[in-house]
Amino acid sequence: MPRFDVYRNSGEYAEVTPYLLDVQSDLLHGLDTRVVVPLRRRDSFPVVGLPANLTPTFEVEGVECLMETPKLAAVPLRLLKSPIASIASKQFEITAALDFLFHGF
């Protein structure tokens, strides 16, 4: 499962958070979980003062989505079906958001 692949969210909140972004290192392929960050529809995100570098936006299937970095979680592999997109080209922004969450810079 390549890092930065995007999967459909089959969970309860899929209408407002339609996608999950895989942010786990490819070197950890033996685990039965993957660390993901929810990608929430930008138009359903409340207006709050979160730093833009913590919650960058990306377009997936024509939908503008906000990376909800503070809500990252591990999910079982069985919940992640076939990837629908890759946003590996946004690696810098994604990694910067994760660094900001964990290190504050």
Predicted ranges, named:
Residues 58-105:
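C-terminal terminal-subdomain/extension
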Residues 3-6, 10, 14-56:
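Compact nucleic-acid interaction/catalytic patches
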Residues 1-3, 95:
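Secondary-structure boundary/capping motif
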